[in-house]
Each structure stands twice: as structure tokens, then as C-alpha cells.
């Protein structure tokens, strides 16, 4: 549909629409976000999910076409990566389509415990040395020889490195560095192919949902260091060490989020965080109050204090935890929900926090377009009242979502979401 507006005007119009929603004002209409993920494979009809890892140019063009055709207010296009960089290093805890999985299979994470229960002191005392000589060898097959390197503090001194250099000459260590070099080359190719995407989309009038990321400290430990089983046991067996680790990681997460300020665009600049293991089903309220919420809250407050808008993705069901979000700065964040009842979220947070979400991915997969339209109409009526609501799918789109249903979702705000 022709608007007669320039890309610059459309970009600012969309940014203002989002700003108004964040600030709990009434925009001209309800904003809508498209999370493309692996959906471009289905939309363009000639690619597989594996192409997001192995044909970066084609995947970027497919993603661009998807966004330009459907015309959301914001987009999130996080999917894929360099399959060759991954292949060079041999990840033990990750499988991706086209290598170990079918070309149209979703990527898979494999639970592990790279940080063992009795290694907290080692990790806390020197996370850099732990990462190099323990974490990387356990997570990447090609980097297993790094376990033979000398402790990093043992290299301090004007001439010490020379006397400690022998391990670096071992054939297996050299091979590990060669694998890392090859991965770096492949990642550089990937970066060159994808680094201009956000600016290209901006020049077409489309802002991104987020300009950077910052991880929740507890999730860093549970996702990447101790695994879910290990972290859940630590809440009983190693609570003090777990809390110390969360505190240490918090500063890194804040720094990661603040780096978003360097983004060329964004008014305001937005920082995303996917929250994996803080929902109702993972821990009790007491455990949430002790282990999860304190560092997450401080992360969000620290970023909003710097003028950033935090966009936490509350995965799972957060119905029992909604009141905690009232402790966050009013009108400064976007609470994106996956499976939380949005009517309840609106009732609790409506005058305090912009909420985002709503359309179940299952509906986009199997329902008729009319069913999707009816669902969106009702959702907009309930959650859009008074402003402070952004429509999107419950999760990132896969290649199983029906294109006509995704289009219906996006078009619904133009039909039913005008204030």
C-alpha cells in the first residue's frame, strides 16, 4: 500500500508509535512487531532454515523481503549464524539445521555443566582463566587442548611468558588455534554479509525491536555454565556461591546493555533480554525473590537509568510474578510475554508498563485467517484500551507459520487498533 511518505518519515512515524506505547500514551494506532526468526524460509518459499547458517546473502534478502512486504512497525530478525564458524570449532552443546539436524529443523541446545559444582571458587576467583582452560575445552571440541595451557596469572612478569611458552608449541594446541583462526575468518565473512542489514532496513523505513542485548545473570549461569539441573541443585546445595556468581555476572550484563548506546539509530535505543528460567514453572516465589529477581531488577534499572528502554521477554508463564514488574520504572520498559494471560497482565500492569505479545504461534500455524483476525480483534480490544500495548506473536516465528496468518496479524492493527 502506497503511503506517499518517505522512508525517513515512515521510520520516525514507527519510532513515535512505539515511543508513545512505551510511555503509556495513545499512539495513532496499536503498534505491531514481526519477529521473523526462521519464518523467511516459509515466506519466500525457496529456502530452508539451513540457509540461515550457510547462505547469508540469500537469507538476508529473504528476511528483507519478508519485512518490506508485511510492513510491521518493528522487526526482530535474530536467526542463523555462520555454520562454517560453528563447524570449525565443533560445538558440543549446540546443533543447527544442515549439520546434525535436518535442513528445516529448529536449532537445538544440549544441556551440560561446563562449570562443575565444586568449581565455583575457581570460577569466581578468576573467570578469565576458568573460561580459557576449563570452559572452552568442555564446550568446543576443537579447543579441548586449551586445557593444557598454563594458568593465565602464571604468565605475569616481564619475561615470564617466554619461560611458560612451551605448551603453545604442542601440535594439538597449534591445531586448536588454527581452528579458532578459521572460525574467525568465517565469522568475519558472516559479519560482512550481515552487518549492514539494520542500516539497510532503516533506510527502507523499518526500525528494529532492539539494538542490543543484555542477559539475566541467573540465566547466564543456568543456560551456559551449570545447566538447569545443576543450577536448581545449587539453590539448595550452593546458594551462596550461586548468588556470588549472579553478582559477578551482573556487571558484565550491564556493560553489554550499555554498549547499545553506541548504536547509530534508535529513539529511544532498546535492549532485549530473553528470560528463560524465572517463570512460574521453574522456581518458587521465595526462590525467585532470592536468586532471580534481585539481579534482574538491578539490570533493568541500571539500563533505564542510562536512557535505554529494556525489553525483557518473559518466556513461559509469569502470571504469579506480574506484581514484581511494578517495582520497575514506570513507562520505561516493554514487557514482552510469551504465554502469560495478557488480559491479566493488562489488568495488573496497564497503568505502569507497556505490554507486548498476544498471538499464539500455534494459531498462526493451523488456524484460518478469519480465526486469527477474530483473535487479534478481541486482543486489541482488551489490551489496547488506553494505549500501552504492542501486538506480536507469542514467540519468534518458525517456518511453520502460515504467511497469510502472519499478514492477517499485522494488518489487524490497522483495522481494529486505530485510536
Where are these predicted regions, by residue range?
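Catalytic cores of TIM-barrel enzymes
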Residues: 1-419
Amino acid at each position: 500500500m502506497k503511503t506517499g511518505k518517505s522512508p525517513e518519515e515512515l521510520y520516525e512515524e514507527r519510532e513515535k508509535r512505539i515511543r508513545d506505547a512505551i510511555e503509556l500514551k495513545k499512539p495513532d494506532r496499536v503498534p505491531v512487531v514481526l519477529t521473523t526468526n526462521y519464518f523467511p524460509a516459509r515466506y519466500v518459499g525457496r529456502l530452508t532454515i539451513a540457509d540461515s547458517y550457510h547462505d547469508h546473502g540469500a537469507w538476508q534478502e529473504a528476511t528483507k523481503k519478508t519485512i518490506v512486504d508485511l510492513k510491521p512497525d518493528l522487526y526482530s530478525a535474530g536467526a542463523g549464524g555462520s555454520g562454517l564458524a560453528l563447524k570449525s570449532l565443533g560445538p558440543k552443546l549446540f546443533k543447527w539445521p544442515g549439520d546434525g539436524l535436518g535442513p528445516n529443523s529448529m536449532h537445538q541446545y544440549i544441556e551440560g555443566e561446563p562449570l562443575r559444582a565444586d568449581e565455583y571458587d575457581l570460577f569466581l576467583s578468576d573467570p578469565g582463566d576458568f573460561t580459557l582452560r576449563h570452559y572452552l575445552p568442555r564446550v568446543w571440541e576443537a579447543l579441548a587442548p586449551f586445557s593444557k595451557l598454563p594458568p593465565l596469572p602464571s604468565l605475569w612478569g616481564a619475561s615470564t611468558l617466554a619461560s611458560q611458552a612451551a605448551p603453545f608449541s604442542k601440535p594439538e594446541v597449534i591445531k586448536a588455534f588454527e581452528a579458532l583462526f578459521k572460525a574467525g575468518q568465517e565469522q568475519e565473512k558472516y559479519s560482512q554479509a550481515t552487518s549492514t542489514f539494520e542500516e539497510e532496513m532503516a533506510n527502507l523505513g523499518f526500525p528494529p525491536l532492539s539494538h542490543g542485548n543484555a542477559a539475566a545473570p541467573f540465566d547466564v549461569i543456568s543456560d551456559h555454565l551449570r545447566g538447569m539441573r545443576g543450577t536448581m541443585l545449587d539453590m539448595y546445595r550452593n546458594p551462596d556461591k550461586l548468588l556470588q556468581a549472579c553478582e559477578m555476572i551482573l556487571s558484565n550484563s550491564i556493560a553489554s546493555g550499555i554498549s547499545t548506546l553506541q548504536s547509530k539509530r534508535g529513539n529511544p535505543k532498546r535492549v532485549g533480554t530473553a528470560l528463560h528460567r524465572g517463570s512460574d514453572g521453574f522456581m518458587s516465589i521465595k526462590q525467585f525473590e532470592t536468586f532471580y529477581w534481585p539481579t534482574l531488577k538491578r539490570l533493568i534499572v541500571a539500563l533505564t537509568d542510562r536512557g535505554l528502554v529494556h525489553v525483557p521477554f518473559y518466556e513461559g508463564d509469569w502470571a504469579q510474578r506480574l506484581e514484581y514488574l511494578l517495582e520497575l520504572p514506570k513507562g520505561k520498559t516493554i514487557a514482552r510475554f510469551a504465554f502469560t494471560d495478557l488480559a491479566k497482565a493488562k489488568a495488573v500492569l496497564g497503568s505502569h508498563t507497556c505490554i507486548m505479545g498476544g498471538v499464539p504461534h500455534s494459531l498462526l500455524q493451523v488456524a484460518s485467517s478469519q480465526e486469527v483476525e477474530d483473535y487479534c480483534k478481541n486482543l486489541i480490544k482488551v489490551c489496547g484500551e488506553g494505549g500501552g500495548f504492542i501486538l506480536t506473536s507469542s514467540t519468534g516465528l518458525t517456518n511453520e507459520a502460515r504467511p497469510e496468518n502472519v499478514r492477517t496479524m499485522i494488518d489487524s492493527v490497522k483495522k481494529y487498533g486505530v485510536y
